[in-house]
Amino acid sequence: MRFAIAAAFGLLAGGCSKGDNAPPVATVSFSASKARVPLGAPIDLTYKFNVAPNAAISGDYRVFVHVVDDNGNPIAWNDDHDPKPPTSQWKPGQTIEYTRTVFVPVTPYVGDATVEVGLYKGNDRLTLMGPDGSDKTATARAYKVGTIHLLPPSESIFLIKKSGWHPAEFGADNPGTEWQWSQKTAVLAFKNPRRDITFYLEFDARTDVFSDHPQQVTVYSGSQIVESFAADNGGAVLKRIPVTAAQLGDAEQAELRIEVDRTFVPSKQPAGGKDVRELGLRVYHAYVEAR
């Protein structure tokens, strides 16, 4: 199920008093792959910009995407990002469209959440003409473009990290970023939905450690190989792995096993250190979705 609401972008010509009078430089559409999504689940967000015939944007602006609750209070979730291509390369009449997959953070709030979009560079924001008439005089230039209904995490298939996982870690400069390192073999267990599923695995690999050739990753359901790939990405990458109901088997509990052909111990690397753990992949998200 998809929804889309269009808005128009205007170039910021100066301070905003009772309204923004700058001409729109583009029309933006926002859509989500799901109108209702559990906390912790992945969702595809699509942004489409139809650049106006006489538009001119000076420099590179970032897109901010903030989510607020039904009282207008911010939820600890945003999708701020650099558009591709950057705004300095946008041409009059051009259509810019791209999709980003994000995982909804687990927050205390459930219910309707409003998505607000803007375009900014430092303290400068471009004017938007959104679908909500009241936004025409919004001095914050954050424009309401859609609504997503957030469901409790219990609506998702609950995953148990059964074995082969190190404790969770957090980014020192970004506490919202969490990961767990796997060992050579890591097992996830969950109640068998007896349906086809998609297994989402977001991870990165130490390509600097395995510079001769990348680690080989194999995902099993029982004794069956459901996916095999090279971990040749230095940054985070998301794999969507289809698994059939037949591959999950008939048992009440299903398991997915992630194996790497090689591991490393940080303390044995040239940089040294005190970390003596056996590390495989750094996993940011693991999620099972019934199809």
Where are these regions (language model features)?
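C-terminal luminal/periplasmic domains and tails of membrane-associated envelope-modifying transferases
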Residues: C16-R291
